[in-house]
Curated annotation (Swiss-Prot):
Domain of life, source organism: Bacteria
A family per Pfam: Proteasome
Sequence intervals crossing the membrane: none
GO terms for cellular component: cytoplasm; proteasome core complex, alpha-subunit complex
Keywords: Acetylation, Cytoplasm, Proteasome, Virulence
Function: Component of the proteasome core, a large protease complex with broad specificity involved in protein degradation.
Keyword DNA-binding attributed: no
UniProt-annotated location(s): Cytoplasm
Name of the protein described by the UniProt record: Proteasome subunit alpha
Native organism: Mycobacterium tuberculosis (strain CDC 1551 / Oshkosh)
N-acetylserine modification, residue list: S2
Amino acid sequence: MSFPYFISPEQAMRERSELARKGIARAKSVVALAYAGGVLFVAENPSRSLQKISELYDRVGFAAAGKFNEFDNLRRGGIQFADTRGYAYDRRDVTGRQLANVYAQTLGTIFTEQAKPYEVELCVAEVAHYGETKPPELYRITYDGSIADEPHFVVMGGTTEPIANALKESYAENASLTDALRIAVAALRAGSADTSGGDQPTLGVASLEVAVLDANRPRRAFRRITGSALQALLVDQESPQSDGESSG
């Protein structure tokens, strides 16, 4: 007589967690950090069409690591939720904390009820409305729906420990955009060097996706930094002059 295969709930949760963590660890790293002008997002991403960083609403941005199709579904769902709420009530009623809570509930439900968890980690960031003085808000949402409020920076995907350690040593509050980008890129290089046997990789315009939530913009804070504008900022890291211009 054969007995049905039984797995305890605790073991099932452990296996789901391990699956999700391994999937996220295979992804390229993403860093989000607060700087003097708002929030800077920097991702290792050689693709120009599959974006890991996005605008969610006027003052709210999004970054993710993991499986693209899974976090892109979440991104589009977040945009739809924000648009609907902003239209039904008021644009100021859409907040980063609110969207982070929605994502946490969604991921928690998927983790406990579906056969396979999402292999994703998310960051939702918000800057103050134009004319207000309030520090940026950064929220990390993990595959199981856990949510954490991070005061300075968020690291996701890849080998996070060396990147987080580098940021702990080099992060400076109220840094300029040029300095913040230098800190973020150096931290990403530290993570890549850890996985490549100590060789410091070259992270340039072609391999980086960069965007900011600019608190000094009147309505829509999100802007991408690409092409010559990004190149100028990367060059300024060696001979700092100005924060340059952005495009996109």
